[in-house]
Amino acid sequence: MSLSEKGRTYVLFAIVVLACAFGSLTQTVMNSMLGGVEADFGVNASVGQWLTTIYMLVLGITVPAVTFLSQRLSLRNVVFLALGLFLVGGIVDVLAPTFGVLVFGRVLQAVGAGITLPVLQSIAMTRFPKGQNGTAMGIAGIAMGFAPNIGPLIGGALVDSWGWRSFFWLFIAIVVLLILAAFLLIAREDAPMRDARFEGVSFLYSALGFGGLLLAFSNAASLGVQSPLVWVPAVVGIACLVFFVARQKRIEHPLISMRIFESSHFRISFIAQNCLFASFMGITLIVPLYVQGLCGGSAVEAGIAFIPATILAVVVNPLAGILSDKVGARPVVIVAAALLTVGAVSMAFMDENTPLWMTTLMQTVRGMGVSALIGPLNSWGMSGLPREIMMDASAFFAAVRQACASLGTAIMVLVITSLSATAQSGAMNMSFAYQAAFGISAVLAACVLIVVIAKVR
């Protein structure tokens, strides 16, 4: 690889890392901004929650189609498409006169984020030399680990100081800079398969499958598992995903090649990372609820709990990737999973008297484990795959990961809601509701530790 080719690869990678980071950030930033949005538009919490629900739904639906886009368009144009959707979505949201318009802007942003997630992982695994994949994936992990952690902090600070629209002004400015950088610095290239055909039936199954599950998990937190709005989309989602997988195995040109599961590395990484994200994404919502709802803190104080882990993630993510390239993935992911488990188990013992510094310390230990796991586990899992199905693996994994993150969050919120009602009757201490939710995260973290010790070689 010549110096100029290296430079183009690094520039492309940097732009997509930043784009993906902002896509991930916009998913969690709304957790701290919902109160302000609901007050401005006069909607209740159940309606306001659609700002986060619709984002997850559209993100999960979009991701599987990225394989087709990567075949039909050049990588440069795929990046422009994602950034363009970010920009238009941000403009719609900052000017939104009604709640419905605000939701539409979130839909556009979610489509952009759904495009960047698998593209980022594919670049890390296919555009870098074999000995640098772990490092590249570690840097990519900043977008998946650092950005969601900082979302509640940014959202809380902005909504307390300048209102929720200020975030979208900041978002627009950064996206404009990324578009200019992409236009000036990303090299033009031909699309790999100009005659690629879109497999519409497979996409329909995928959209109904992932969309149904995400909708079911989101509704479960507020409606309970007995509601038809939970079990009907869940049944439809599971059935459609079964049809989707069966069709991918049968047709000549699948939307997502199921050959990805022929790799034992990918199967193991797939299981471990889905447990990781179910544990990780739920906590980004539960910690703000705990600090504000149980301990009486402000939105800024809730965000403070994420600051050290967020700062350390910038160092830990690439460092873990570098170490995995040098000494192998196994020692790195075992230490990382141990940190994750220790932090998660410790958080299960927090109550209303736990000081903010202690909450921050435990969240920092847990966050370091997450940061050190994402990159090495990703690169190890994809290392045994043929180059031509890397995008398939990235897209399918990103979609399933989103569903698992939503499931973990829904279960934790459902536990808090159910046990809080019991606590209000005087039957138990309110802190037990949050301890039970943190306990679920701890169990998932322990599952990750068991899998990496037993299977990652």
What are these regions (language model features)?
Residues 108-142:
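Cytoplasmic helix-loop-helix junction between adjacent transmembrane helices
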Residues 99, 192-194, 220-226, 353:
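Membrane-interface helix caps and helix-loop-helix hairpins in membrane proteins
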Residues 91-92, 157, 211, 215, ...:
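Alpha-helical transmembrane segments of multipass membrane proteins
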Residues 2-3, 7, 131, 179-207, ...:
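Flexible interhelical linker loops that connect adjacent transmembrane helices
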Residues 8-25, 30-34, 41-67, 71-79, ...:
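12-transmembrane solute porter fold
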Residues 172-191, 207-219, 235-250, 448-456:
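C-terminal membrane-cytosol helix-exit motif in multi-pass small-molecule transporters
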Residues 59, 119-121, 125, 177-191, ...:
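Hydrophobic, membrane-facing alpha-helical anchors
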Residues 140-180, 198-234:
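Helix-loop-helix hairpin linking two adjacent transmembrane segments in secondary transporters
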